[in-house]
Amino acid sequence: MKVLFNGRLMERSECAVDIEDRGYQFGDGVYEVIRIYNGILFTLDEHIARLYKSAAEIGIDLSFSEAELKSQLKELVDINQRRDGGLYLQVTRGKAPRKHQYGAGLTPQVTAYTFPIQKPEKEQQNGVSAITADDMRWLRCDIKSLNLLYNVMIKQKAQEASAFEAILIRDGLVTEGTSSNVYVAKQNVIYTHPVTTLILNGITRMKVLQLCEENGLNYEEKAVTKDELLNADEVFITSTTAEVIPVTSIDGQTIGSGAPGPLTKNVQTALQNSILSETAKTV
């Protein structure tokens, strides 16, 4: 399998990261995960724009253009003949002697590779369970940082509880999942946390809200309480790899009817239609 390493395509076995790379020692970097459908990188423009924004927020200057990077990623997908799956893209600040502060002139290290994804069809159709947990992450969740330690810890707790996701609560309000955005439906209105530094503005989130507007589905960007979450008619989550998944129980409590609801199904259908439309190759 070929990987992209600092602008070059090479075998994965040939790729070597320096032990003093700041991404390795500090998690000093940013990343994106992009879904591949029909050999096409879905919402590529939005992912790359967010990568550059995240990099700028932490002071990483990318010397290459967005167009150059997109071209390299498309070539990577083609050379690996990856028709369906995902692409992981990471940028670190670069290598330097280990100390917290960083000097000028570091060269960012860019890596990318493709991987298979098994579409969570059963979960999308039947729904999943979730737990809640205190949101104790740092206050710049809008940056897609490599620092995911708390997310990892809480996601592991969810797995140990036989749950698919953990929904995070800060000051009594629902923020997001450990690796997803969260939506609460009540009386035919879909609520989701507004775009602030407390959540990552997910690419699938952006697409879903666009599709809600186009399909006449009512939504409001408003934080809801934990009680409102537990007493919702419907709850669902979105992410690049999960797409749209209904949540039918939280902390052992049944949500709504205990089955995927009509609003969730409408959002699922709208997203699938958008994916098919945007990744259809013309002859």
Curated annotation (Swiss-Prot):
Q: Which residues participate directly in catalysis?
A: K144
This protein's cofactor list reads:
pyridoxal 5'-phosphate
Q: What is its EC number?
A: 2.6.1.21
Residues reported in the UniProt entry to bind substrate: Y31, R98, H100
Sorted alphabetically, which keywords does the UniProt record give? Aminotransferase, Pyridoxal phosphate, Transferase
CDD domains named in the record: D-AAT_like (cd01558)
GO MF term set: D-alanine-2-oxoglutarate aminotransferase activity; pyridoxal phosphate binding
Domain of life of the source: Bacteria
InterPro entries with a match to the protein in the record: Aminotrans_IV, Aminotrans_IV_CS, Aminotransferase-like, BCAT-like_C, BCAT-like_N, Class-IV_PLP-Dep_Aminotrnsfr, D_amino_transT
- GO CC annotation terms, alphabetical: cytosol
Positions that bind pyridoxal 5'-phosphate = R50, E176
Any Pfam family the entry gives: Aminotran_4
Modified residue annotations for N6-(pyridoxal phosphate)lysine = K144
Q: Which GO terms describe its biological process?
A: D-amino acid biosynthetic process; D-amino acid catabolic process
Reaction equation(s) it catalyzes: D-alanine + 2-oxoglutarate = D-glutamate + pyruvate
Q: Which PANTHER family match?
A: AMINO-ACID AMINOTRANSFERASE, D-ALANINE AMINOTRANSFERASE
The entry describes its oligomerization and partners as: Homodimer.
Family to which this protein belongs: Belongs to the class-IV pyridoxal-phosphate-dependent aminotransferase family.
- Function according to Swiss-Prot or TrEMBL: Acts on the D-isomers of alanine, leucine, aspartate, glutamate, aminobutyrate, norvaline and asparagine. The enzyme transfers an amino group from a substrate D-amino acid to the pyridoxal phosphate cofactor to form pyridoxamine and an alpha-keto acid in the first half-reaction. The second half-reaction is the reverse of the first, transferring the amino group from the pyridoxamine to a second alpha-keto acid to form the product D-amino acid via a ping-pong mechanism. This is an important process in the formation of D-alanine and D-glutamate, which are essential bacterial cell wall components.
Protein name, UniProt field: D-alanine aminotransferase
Organism, by scientific name, is Bacillus licheniformis
